[in-house]
Amino acid sequence: MDDSDTPTYYLQIEPQDGCHPGDSVERSVTCLPSASDENENQLDGDGHEHLTSSDSAMGKPQVSEQDSLNNNESCTLSCEVAAGENLQNTLCEASRDEQAFLGKDKKIPGKRSPRSKKGTAKKIPPGLFSGDIAPLMQEKVLSAVTYAVDDEEAAEVNANEQPEAPKLVLQSLFSLIRGEVEQLDSRALPLCLHQIAESYFQEEDYEKAMKFIQLERLYHEQLLANLSAIQEQWETKWKTVQPHTVTALRNSEKGFNGEDFERLTKICATHQDPLLSKHKIAAVEKSQERKCSTQLLVSEDPKEGGATTKESESKTCLGTESSKESQHTVEPLGSSPCCHQMDVQTDSPSLSVTAGKDHMEELLCSAEATLALHTQSSETAGSPSGPDSSEDACEDDSRLQLAQTEACQDVARIEGIAEDPKVFLSSKSKTEPLISPGCDRIPPALISEGKYSQAQRKELRLPLRDASEALPTDQLENNELNELQQPDLTDSDGKSPQAQADSDGSENVLCGNNQISDLGILLPEVCMAPEEKGDKDDQLNKETEDYLNSLLEGCLKDTEDSLSYEDNQDDDSDLLQDLSPEEASYSLQENLPSDESCLSLDDLAKRIEIAEVVPTEGLVSILKKRNDTVGDHPAQMQHKPSKRRVRFQEIDDSLDQDEVGGGSCILLVLLCIATVFLSVGGTALYCTFGDMESPVCTDFADNMDFYYTKLLQGVAELKHWIYLS
């Protein structure tokens, strides 16, 4: 089939951004198949296929990329892909007309150019939401917000774009609100109202924006009223509950403490919702996560991928549809930036294999699938769209077969090593590969014996492209299988497509640019057998038990010896009182065994105890008191409490509290009288020998005249009463 012929079953759709062939921005062509068996899933691997100026001048239409999924196999797989994108959120119907309608906007996640981020939201019928739930509606609202983000970016790129996408967003939000009203479930209603108000505000239709923001405010006011009613009901219930049940519930609660509640209170009191930018970010992140999960779902089925690649290879070798197959890129891994970091993580669970042949067969299938994908990507990138593409594809197919046979041999070798009981590995090895940023060498945690000592080490030397992709070598199967899979990823990511098409296929897959040196860096001390570890653990446990038993016996002996020494000390108490503390401790230490080599830590501690227990003058020993209770010294027992009684009686002989209070009152009155006399006398002295005409002295003279006349009158009346009596 000649490339110059224009296929009649492809329909070219012009983009709606107002661009023309003469503009600087390249035209993008979206092709829709009309046949029922054609693949409808358009692959957006690196944006739309752009027509260069020369191709557009010659009038050659290029077919956009397609993925390797067959739409006629199952409807659920296409639904999973559509749900992973989650930008249109349409339901999967059984009819072919509905699938053809959905196929216009359905795309496998991949890299997106800034031009391909324009919002192409479709109208969502209200009937589709009759069976959905509120969280799904919230996700759909967030998808509508994603369209708003894409519309803003598109407006920045192209200023001549007509404002059709915001209208589509508003229509989708209106359909959401209709579904909410029908279901009588309004949890997503305030979010819809806020997004509609934001859309009208951006369009400068402030009247409608104010109406919808007022509706949102009414919703939240009613929500607050309902919450306050619920709170009042709970408070009344709380007051009627008995106290013991409340404490039981409080003791059973162990999840949150005071700090957690303070943090939550601070967050609830300082949040700035509703804020559109925050919802935008959340929507974008959510859509990217769904893209990643969809890619993982697509890439987890290696057998179907292998089958489709084999079919495409046969078509390419026959040369019937070389122009179509040259455009195919069936490798979704590493296509989007957010999913590139998850490639190694998705390989590790699929390659975490226990010992068994079934898992080895799965490995073989996945290895074949990745080899096929790698070779096909080299075909698509390196081969031109012409008659030579079929020859190059056939050559690459032969290289692929050689690489697959070599991969089968390596897998068989790994099976032999895994089944050999002589090769053993530490179950809980704490060593990790020592990897430097610029080094591609790994010290394996493998100990082999016999025939696997040197020969198998040389066979197991496999390349590792990036040190950051090195996985833990806890088991032999994981180690070798990961090293088989990692060259495929590194070759598809790191090498140029032309170099992949020209180089040998088997060397590209199993031997990379970097080679690992001799596997001689082993740690036999750490990688020991589990049985030897168990024996050593038992021995350590026995030693610790013996040591603890000896400590307990030593402590009991020490207590007995201390009691015996206390008895001897009571007998010689008179002698010890005449000596100084140093001499007493020295004399007591002489009673201990003289052989220093036989002394243990317990004996030394016993010496310290005896030195501390030595009584001094004026102090009473606690141990002596304990021994006195037995009945050795009853006279001393009666004598000591008597001394204490005498001391308390001395305190009781002091002044009574009432007497002390009366004396304090008399003292206070005397102090007041003395203060009055001192003040009056001081003022009189100042006025007598100082300034007589000062205002203080004049006031003082008037007061003295007044009080003096009063005093004279009182004295006269007193004399009169005395005379009468």
UniProtKB/Swiss-Prot annotation:
Keywords of this entry: Cell membrane, Cytoplasmic vesicle, Golgi apparatus, Membrane, Transmembrane, Transmembrane helix
Localisation per UniProt entry: Cell membrane; Golgi apparatus, trans-Golgi network membrane; Cytoplasmic vesicle, Secretory vesicle
Bias type Polar residues, positions: 63-72, 343-353, 375-388
Keyword field contains Magnesium: no
Topological domains, Cytoplasmic: 1-664
Start-end of Basic residues biased regions: 109-121
GO molecular function, one term: phosphatase binding
Highest taxon in the source lineage: Eukaryota
Main location, first listed in the record: membrane
Segments traversing the membrane: 665-685
Alphabetical GO biological process terms: positive regulation of Golgi to plasma membrane protein transport
Pfam hit, one: Consortin_N
Membrane topology designation: Single-pass membrane protein
GO annotation, cellular component aspect: intracellular membrane-bounded organelle; membrane; plasma membrane; protein-containing complex; trans-Golgi network; transport vesicle
Extracellular side: 686-725
Annotated segments matching region Disordered: 1-72, 103-124, 296-353, 375-397, 485-510
InterPro entries (UniProt xref): Consortin (IPR042318), Consortin_C (IPR028129), Consortin_N (IPR054132)
Compositionally biased residues, Basic and acidic residues: 300-314
Cell membrane keyword on record: yes
Family of the protein in this entry: Belongs to the CNST family.
Matching PANTHER family: CONSORTIN (PTHR28581:SF1)
Protein function: Required for targeting of connexins to the plasma membrane.
Subunit details: Interacts with connexins GJA1/CX43, GJB1/CX32, GJB2/CX26, GJB3/CX31, GJB6/CX30 and GJC1/CX45. Also interacts with GGA1 and GGA2. Does not interact with PANX1.
Protein name (Swiss-Prot/TrEMBL): Consortin
Source species taxonomy: Eukaryota, Metazoa, Chordata, Craniata, Vertebrata
Record gene name: CNST
